């Protein structure tokens, strides 16, 4: 379903049927956004000019509905395969978009451009329709920028939720003595040593207790040089600095992390998969800061959870609120 890639490079549409495929749509949209982010603007050939914005939108939907690659090339331009992933699109994702389109659709005006809006939740196609002296066309460059912006926003929200999941996982982990030494402690790593339960995730056999953290998150956070998890890398911090509540102290005592826990998350590719970096500690409050283009090196060098005034506290994400 190569044609359907145009549909799913964005947020969920919001209809009930769309929500059933939200996870699948997200994975495809992420791939599409990354592919488009790497595309030089010079490769974007001119798409067809239409008499109205509605005509342009209708042509796109018709191409998607028929899975007509030739028609899509006319709508978006002959180089569409360069920036739209040609494989891995599920038909149900396409059908979800078409169902939302059938339920309700219109041309939304704003910011000097037109956008195809589908469903009842105000979702718009990320590629805008612009007017020129000869008519209306899809603006692929602006679509690229919008896709990246949506991807970053989505990844950052997911990362904040992932840190809250880490917070819950550490508290769950510390509620049980995992090595029989009668000492409750927090985990110092995400993945357990094979055959042990010394991390937040381990392979559970039938009848054994489940690990606090899911396998997908744990596996990706352990890959320091790979794609990360939802566009972010994660590190566990084992101490806190003077700016943290309670002042500076080590979480690890006698080899056991008993005094608290913390973690930092930073973008895999700054400006493409994320902008903000995030931290959380045993207090359950997420902090954020733009560490800049050198953020990965800064985050990797961090030894302590030390949210000074340059880190913004996200009150809405505080645990228990």
Regions found by a protein language model. Give the residues of each.
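Bacterial N-terminal signal peptides that target proteins for export
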Residues: 18-31
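Short, Lys/Arg-enriched N-terminal segments with co-localized hydrophobic residues
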Residues: 1-18
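Surface-exposed, charged secondary-structure patches
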Residues: 81-125, 223-230, 235-242, 249-257
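Short beta-strand edge/turn micro-motifs at domain boundaries
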Residues: 114-157, 161-164, 168, 285-289
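Bacterial N-terminal signal peptides
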Residues: 28-40
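Conserved hydrophobic/amphipathic alpha-helical signal-anchor segments
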Residues: 51-68, 73, 144-194
